[in-house]
Amino acid sequence: DVKFPETENNSHRKIVSLDKSWRVKFTHTNADSITSLIPETKVSLPNNLDDYYGYRQLKHGNLHGSAVYQRSINVEKREEKRYFLELQGVETYATLIVNGYRYPKELVGRTVFTEDITQHLHNGDNELSIEVDHPEYIKDSPWVCGGCSSEWGFSEGSQPFGIYRPVSL
């Protein structure tokens, strides 16, 4: 397990960890013959869906594709407050869906991404989904897959796939 520093709770802002109670399911991958056999799985974050770390010494052994993470959250919504979802690391693109509202797809990578979800959050139970896309041969991100590089062994096996850092509200 990876441990991250505890958040300060003595400020005016309340930060709630959403790292527990996720369900994840592959939607498609470059290894569909293997990943299609994997049922929806319960996970905690951080979570790397690609367990290949270069040990097979392949030029391109990385897993690419899409998956969806889902969970319910219960919120005591107060009208005078704003609610932000913070993703600290998703490889490579993330699409947030809050109670059926689909936010635009964002390049997240190894940066922190924050979205104001106040307008689509309800008092009480809410459904949250994060669609994760990690395609092959990425050209619009500084964090490319080493296996997709034309250079042999360039960071091969080092690219995570999924939500690999904390998520908070």
Regions found by a protein language model. Give the residues of each.
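Short, solvent-exposed aromatic-acidic interface loops
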Residues: 91-92
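Beta-strand-rich ligand-recognition modules
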Residues: 3-5, 97-149
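Residues within well-ordered beta-strands of beta-sheet-rich folds
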Residues: 70-74, 82-86, 95-97, 116, ...
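Extended carbohydrate-recognition surfaces in non-catalytic/accessory domains of CAZymes
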Residues: 1-88, 143-166
